[in-house]
Structures are given as structure tokens and as C-alpha cells.
């Protein structure tokens, strides 16, 4: 693991992907379940102060998320634009806490993930790709129902920033490798939107290979590792009951 990059990040720091995921996790823990108003409040807090990130300011945020967060309120948290530019991969990068909190109920995980995605990304493609991603991540495998969604061109060295390309590219990195580490290295070394494709790949590969497959040398460098693990455990406990 190395630092640097366009934001000169230290080893183990996270970008907007991680910050928004932590903001969602905090809302679930505080409210003991899905609370879009609390998630909106946390997003706005992060946008203003950098809280939930690794610094006391926001050093990385996409235009779609930034515009939506500025527009959303706790009374109306669903502020995602609906134009063709609002089909970015930022809607997938932050969903791990929702799947942890609903690990016994895929339909609930899908519904809540779609809702949180629509808070910042309102394009019509978001719903089907979010449902596909959550379903296949929680099952730990590709399914024939979503085969067509993975046929987006992934041969280019750079990703496009769209949800379509990120979803296909992440699965490609998992399918063409045989370990968590190799999948992540393949994904992030494509460059361009490496943090987001890496985050999406990490969820898929994490489900496939398990926590024990994450290299210890990576975990040792992770900023606030103990706090993140504690949050993950609290989220997992929220999903103790099966679907009703």
C-alpha cells in the first residue's frame, strides 16, 4: 500500500467513498436502523466539516454528490438529479453498511440501498444497477438475471465514472483474479476513478473471500481501523432477524 495520488493521501486514508459509507454507518447505529433524515444530516455535516472522513475538511467529492447534498434537507433527503449525468458510480461506492445492517434480508438491503442511492443519484439506471449490485454482492456470485448489465465495455484502461462501467469493471476484476488482494490491485490499477471502482470491487471480493482474506499489511495501515471494525460489528448486530 502506498500513499500519494491526486489528493496526496496518506497510506490507509479513505476518500469520499469511505467518508459517505461511514456517515451512513453512523446513522444506522445512532437510529438503530434506516433513517434517511439522519443520513442526510450526516452527509451535510461531512460536506461542511469533513467529519466522517480522515481530515477536518472535504478533499474529495464528486459534482453529483456535492450538488445533491447542498440541495437536500432532513425533511426531503431525496435530492438526486434525474438527468443522464446523474448515473455516476457514487451511488454504489458507499453501500457496504446497508448490506451489513441487513445481512439476513436481501430485499430490505435492496430497498434501503436504492433509497440511499436516490438521495444523490436520481437517474433511471440507478435502481436496476443498485438492485443488481446488492443482490449479487450478498449472494457472493454473478447471477443470470443481471448478465446483460455486465456486458458494458470494460476493455478500456480507464473507467468512465458511470455506474454501468464501474459495476462491470468491478466484476471483471473479481472474475479474472483468485484472491481479494489481486482483485483490488487489478481494479485500482486501472486508474482514473480508482477509489470508487476499488470500493465496489472490495465489497464484491470481500463477500467472496471473507474478512480473513484482507492482507494484514493493509489492515495495519488503515486509519481508524479499530473504530471502523467496531462500527461494522454494531451494524452486523442490527441484522439479527430474518425477513418478515
PLM regions with names:
Residues 1-244:
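Structured, active/binding-site neighborhoods that engage oxygen-rich ligands
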